[in-house]
Design a protein with these regions (language model features):
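PLP-dependent enzyme catalytic core of the Aspartate aminotransferase-like
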Residues: 1, 6, 319, 332-363
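A glycine-/small-polar-enriched, mobile loop at the entrance of the PLP active site in fold-type I
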Residues: 5-56
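Active-site phosphate-binding strand-loop segment of PLP-dependent enzymes
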Residues: 12, 111, 123-178
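Conserved N-terminal alpha-helix of the aminotransferase class I/II PLP-enzyme fold
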Residues: 34-81, 88, 102, 110
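PLP-dependent aminotransferase-like
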Residues: 79-146
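Conserved active-site segment immediately N-terminal to the catalytic lysine
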Residues: 171, 185-196, 205
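Active-site C-terminal subdomain of aminotransferase-like
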Residues: 195-277, 291, 360-363
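Conserved PLP-binding catalytic core of the aspartate aminotransferase-like
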Residues: 286-317
């Protein structure tokens, strides 16, 4: 690759689009004649406010976000939102969660600190290899919201059809599939996403929340920074935000617009994932771990059936210039994360390497 870069299959932080990195490099020492790098700017300056405004406007255009939704750029990652969602949205102290993998499981554990959590469906029985049927969930009338992790980064499952919430608010953690395909924001009460997987550098989460869900009658013990009202009333500027992440993400939003938006990005992601899944389906050594109907386009876990051989594959791929293919420590195996910025050439090169590895080890 150009600049001696590697195909980085990390689950996050992950690859960013090369044209974006080049533009950031070119603006590093003197951003648009300001005489300083964005990392050096006051977040209260006019030049930085323009960066924030452009980033929000471009994201709104990309996702066609309705006017009655707020866009917030908040420090920290998705894990902080496990608590923030429950603390801000549990007006009646009750929420329904769907357990589909490691991240929804962690969100459930955190939400239980703030109210009653009903796990209405789970795929734990088959090691989170599918999405349970959520067409007729048992949802109490006084439920504040229904929560899903729309793409489970570790287990590699994704929702192809949203749950029937029976009129209740839907909250979705989209961290590992954010901006990977078109999204009808009106289907959700709230979307949030840690940006380090599919958008920019680590340390920030994007929150898209319907205005009527931003409450004033919140627990007075809640840290003021975790209040969505605090963030919304101050335009994500209650304190110094993650200025660098906002800037970098703004560049990615513009890049996505330039290539044809989320429809085009979705087509590319389908093509990329197909290269790897087609190989896994015919391989005698490597096997995918997710039922085909629920396979993620972003995170592709697979195994050889032998922990020792899995480790050998990881070592061999790293030596060949394909980084971060080791599966998450909680599940083992292997995992290829092919987020937006991964070119299809990366998927093709990985498959060719795995074919060669398989041939050499099955003689």
């Amino acid at each position: 690759m150009k600049y001696g870069r590697t195909f980085n299959f990390s689950a996050g932080p992950a690859m960013m689009p090369e044209p974006v990195l080049e533009e950031i490099r070119d603006e590093m020492m003197n951003y648009r004649g300001s005489g300083m790098c964005v990392m050096e700017m006051s977040h209260r300056s006019k030049v930085f406010q323009q960066i924030v405004d452009e980033a929000e406007a471009d994201l709104r255009e990309l996702m066609n976000i309705p006017d009655n939704y707020k866009v917030l750029f908040i420090q920290g990652g998705a894990t902080l939102q496990f608590a923030a969602v429950a603390w801000n949205l549990m007006k009646n102290g009750k929420a329904v969660y769907i357990e589909t993998g490691a991240w929804s499981k962690k969100a459930i554990a955190e939400a239980k600190k703030y109210g009653e959590v009903i796990v209405a469906a789970s795929s734990k029985d088959k090691n989170y290899s599918y999405i349970p049927d959520c067409s007729d969930l048992d949802i109490p009338e006084d439920t504040d919201y229904v929560y899903i992790c729309e793409n489970e980064t570790i287990h590699g499952v994704t929702w192809n059809k949203l749950p029937n919430t029976k009129g209740h608010v839907l909250v979705s953690d989209q961290s590992s599939m954010f901006l990977s395909k078109p999204c009808n924001v009106s289907d959700y009460g709230m979307i949030y996403a840690g940006v380090q997987k599919n958008v920019g550098p680590a340390g920030m989460v994007v929150v898209i929340i319907r205005e009527d869900l931003i409450r004033e009658d919140i627990d007075p013990k809640m840290p003021i920074y975790m209040s969505y009202k605090t963030q919304a009333d101050n335009g994500s500027m209650y304190n110094t935000p993650n200025c660098w992440a906002i800037y970098c993400c703004g560049k990615v939003f513009k890049y996505l617009k330039s290539i044809g938006g989320l429809e085009e990005m979705h087509k590319r992601n389908i093509a990329k994932a197909k290269v790897i899944y087609d190989f896994l389906d015919q391989s005698k050594m490597f096997k995918g771990t997710v039922e085909p109907e629920f396979r993620s386009l972003m995170n592709i876990p697979f195994v050889t059936g032998s922990a020792e051989l899995d480790a050998e594959v990881v070592a061999a791929t790293k030596a060949a210039g394909y980084d971060n293919l080791k599966g998450h420590k909680s599940v083992g195996g292997l995992r290829a994360s092919v987020y937006n910025a991964m070119p299809i050439e990366g998927a093709e090169a990985l498959v060719e390497f795995l074919k060669k590895f398989e041939a050499e080890h099955t003689k």
